[in-house]
Amino acid sequence: MKDEIASKIYVNLSRCEKGHDSCTEYSSMLHDMVHGHMLYDTVDFVLNQKDVPEIDLLAEVSPYLMNRSDCIGNDGLPYVRGKYKGYNVYVNTHILKINACSLCKYYYGTNMHDFPLEDVRKAIEGIGEDLNIPMDKVTVTRMDSAMDLELQRSPIEYFNRMLDLPYFRRLSYPTGITFQTAEKELLFYDKGKEQGSNNKNIARCEFRIKKVRKCFGKSVTASMLYDPSFWNDLLDRFLSCYSKVKVSKESLPLDKINGIKILKDCALCDYVNRNGFDPLRSGFKARVRDGELAQRACK
């Protein structure tokens, strides 16, 4: 599987045109991924009572839960909340929800581990056996895939150069960045700091599909997760999304800035590098046209 991932990445890189953003020095993150392990991380499951009329989900699943709370809803119907090996579980007379936990962590005790499809199958079948539910009828409502990349430099240096992903909203926070839509999210953060490994430059890349049915155009069942063709489709979607991230070729040389003039010059160079010279020139011409600048400013 690792070789398969590697081949897909090299094919993706070979299609880059000269000068394309993803072919800058920061394509090294793509090359580093050859040495990482793409895996399923957080996966949320749902099973509807109508799909398993032969099973009383509330009665069947409730006894297996830890930290169990038996409640009555506003509709007067009973429901139960509890924990199952790291997962949050909610079950009532209509639906069973199993969510908010890494499938990899459920199986290995950590989400930093190679997770071959055979083990994905064992993990999913294990959930079904423990809770006595048919996993082939369980649907996936959220699906995160992830990869850890060991880098030569601080992950933040890479993240700061990731400028834009078309049709996604970019948000940044102290340890990483995320590109979001209502359906999907591409997230990068410093996994080394999260793990307390300050001496290691480990970046975590996560591809989150928050609306699985809408994204794939069909229901995705738990048993599909370990199907190689489905996994390859997911990899293609991830690589397609990742390859569209626009990155800058250079960052501001903060260690060499010792005055306001140099700062302004560097900021101007950085703007041109990120956006090209044409938008800057067009902006100057517009200001000349509007009388805000003299004609000589554009010469």
Give, region by region, the residue ranges found by the protein language model.
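Structured, helix-rich domain cores that form ligand/interaction pockets
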Residues: 1-282, 286, 290
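Helix-turn-helix DNA-binding segment
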Residues: 288, 293-299
